[in-house]
Regions:
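Ligand/substrate-recognition segments at binding pockets and active sites
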Residues: 373, 377, 381-451, 492, ...
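Gly/Pro-rich hinge or "lid" segments in bacterial periplasmic/extracellular proteins
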Residues: 85-86, 166, 174, 181-250, ...
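Extracellular/periplasmic solute-recognition and catalytic clefts
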Residues: 228-237, 256-312, 335
């Protein structure tokens, strides 16, 4: 839809409030009306939309180092074995059926015979195994490899303690895929939406760093769209996969994803008519578009928090971590950062539902802790830093985005006022921030985690001793045990109790993280676009069956 529109150069505003004033003035003057064409068809009659997304990070290899790019690419281009719709019902995709043994340890999936790669070749069980085997090589950099560990011998293979031949994945024929688990895993079906359980064409997908994943000649897809073009740091284009088994239900011919450095330029691009959808925008946009049909709000199943590096003194002292947690005024923080935020004291996302009760999971237990500045000062004194004296200057690294910059400034001021400690702020480009965190190169580091699947394990697993995302040096045998016990607990009430105990230990007793806030998803969507769906596991928008009405 946006391809024929007038374009303009986007420049990052260094004064976000000035940007808001200018945008408000333009809206008031009636200049910013979206600028959309009357038709969603290009000159040759094809239907297309353009979507603004955050900076280019990560690979498109399901076995590789997944980050933001994959989250836009995969929902449109890849079919998992099955998923769940918004009503919790199974929706078959690459699989047509499955069976599970009485002990819930053997899962057999029957694949569609009509499922084809975008080049017309069959999708087979070996393509699923290809991703799994490559992800279990630590050199792949897959942060999702830990979610393969329920499979028999997968963890041993990852740690170099078992041979690949012992992996509990069987492919007796091209269209049968069998998983044998070490123990029953009650959320195994939820894991299937993760990249490491998706196929990669064994003809081309070899290693995670060979470049095959962003090369349209070798990057095949088994979903509604395939990769047509990828220009690093600028955009990538998906085109309709005519070989898709459900191609008749796919309405769009093309989706272009454009990369933007920050939410301000994303919103500006929407207003200029350069894009049809802009997601995860700032609360300023929510205020400006109140009452307009372009505004599309969602509950993000995500938590914004900070990692403490336990290997940096004095953050190895639980009293210091607790003091910092108790000294932060989250209500004040959210008032300043934006009305799309809400204070949280949990790691598990505020808006994640408990599948058994239908209520928010975090409402099923007491709040892990309460803010208390007086107690925070006592704890800091007990740790040897009365009135903050002698406390070293710590550096907080965060992405150079408006919301994160505002958050950092508030935290710096609150910790100075309440504990008399100094925090040095270091804004980083998004990819650099990701790399610093992944390498453990930080004192304090911003983290934002959107759920990968609809279970609290997606959050609690991140603090396990063997997790790729455990960047803080956490090694807690009691915590590991609680989470492990929850894996195989079939009683949903008992399992929830174990998960709540694990979170209380990590967040309310050991204070391994500094939870900040939950967020509403602030999105701008061209009203002519229909059929956008919301992923119930992540809260993200999906476009595989979207259409344009004009």
């Amino acid at each position: 839809m946006s391809k024929r529109r007038r374009t303009r150069k986007n420049t990052k505003r260094t004064l976000p409030r000035l940007w808001a004033v200018l945008l408000t003035a333009a809206l008031t003057a009636g200049l910013l009306t979206g600028g959309f064409q009357d038709s969603g068809e290009s000159a040759d009659g094809e239907k297309e939309i353009t979507i603004a997304i955050s900076s280019d990070t990560g690979t498109l290899d399901p076995a590789g180092s997944i980050a933001l790019s994959w989250l836009s690419y995969a929902p449109a281009a890849m079919d998992e074995l099955l998923t769940f719709d918004e009503n919790g019902e199974v929706e078959y995709r690459a699989a047509k059926s499955y069976e599970v043994s009485e002990d819930n340890r053997v899962w057999t999936f029957h694949l569609r015979e009509d499922a084809l790669w975008s080049d017309g070749t069959p999708v087979t069980s070996e393509d699923f195994r290809n991703t799994i085997e490559r992800a279990l090589d630590p050199a792949s950099g897959s942060g999702y490899a830990v979610y393969l560990f329920p499979i028999e011998n997968a963890e041993g293979i990852y740690n170099g303690e078992a041979d690949m031949d012992s992996l509990g994945v069987e492919t007796p024929d091209d269209y049968t895929l069998i998983f044998r688990l070490d123990e029953a895993c009650v959320y195994f079906l939820d894991l299937l939406r993760l990249p490491v359980y998706m196929p990669s064409c064994r003809t081309y997908a070899d290693s995670a760093d060979s470049g095959w994943d962003k090369n349209p000649e070798t990057s095949l897809s088994n979903g509604p769209f395939f990769l047509k073009e990828y220009v690093p740091d600028q955009y990538f284009v998906l085109e309709k996969n005519e070989n898709y088994w459900n191609a008749d239900a796919v309405n769009l011919d093309r989706i272009t994803f454009r990369f933007y450095a920050d939410t301000q330029t994303m919103a500006s691009a929407y207003e200029a008519g350069e894009v049809d959808v802009a997601t995860s925008l700032s609360s300023t946009v929510m205020e400006l578009y109140e009452g307009k049909e372009d505004l599309y709000l969602t509950e993000q199943i995500a938590t914004r928090y900070i990692y403490f590096n336990l290997n940096v003194e004095p953050l190895g002292d639980v009293r210091v971590r607790e003091a910092i947690n108790l000294a932060v005024n989250r209500e004040e923080l959210c008032r300043i950062v934006g009305e799309d935020t809400e204070p949280t004291y949990n790691l598990v996302a505020k808006y994640m539902k408990d599948k058994n009760t239908g209520e928010y999971f975090t409402d099923g237990a007491e709040q892990p802790f309460e803010e208390n500045v007086s107690r925070a000062r006592e704890l800091l004194a007990q740790a040897g830093y009365t009135d903050g004296e002698g406390f070293p200057v710590l550096t907080y690294r965060y992405p150079s985005l408006e919301m994160d910059s505002d958050t950092a400034q508030v935290l710096k001021e609150q910790l100075k006022e309440n504990l008399n400690i100094d925090i040095e702020l270091e804004a980083q480009e998004l990819q650099m921030n990701y790399s610093s965190r992944h390498a453990g190169d930080f004192d304090l580091c911003r983290m934002n985690w959107t759920a990968d699947f609809a279970d609290p394990y997606t959050y609690l697993s991140m603090l396990l001793s063997n997790s790729m995302y455990n960047c803080s040096g956490i090694r807690d045998a009691e915590y590991d045990s609680l989470v492990a016990r929850s894996d195989s607990e079939a009683d949903p009430v008992k399992r929830s109790e174990l998960l709540h105990q694990a979170e209380q230990l990590a967040v309310g007793e050991q204070f391994y993280i500094l939870p900040l806030y939950a967020m509403k998803g602030v999105n701008l969507v061209n009203p002519d676009i229909t059929g956008i769906t919301r992923n119930p596991a992540t809260g993200g928008l999906e476009y595989r069956y979207a259409d344009v009405s004009k």
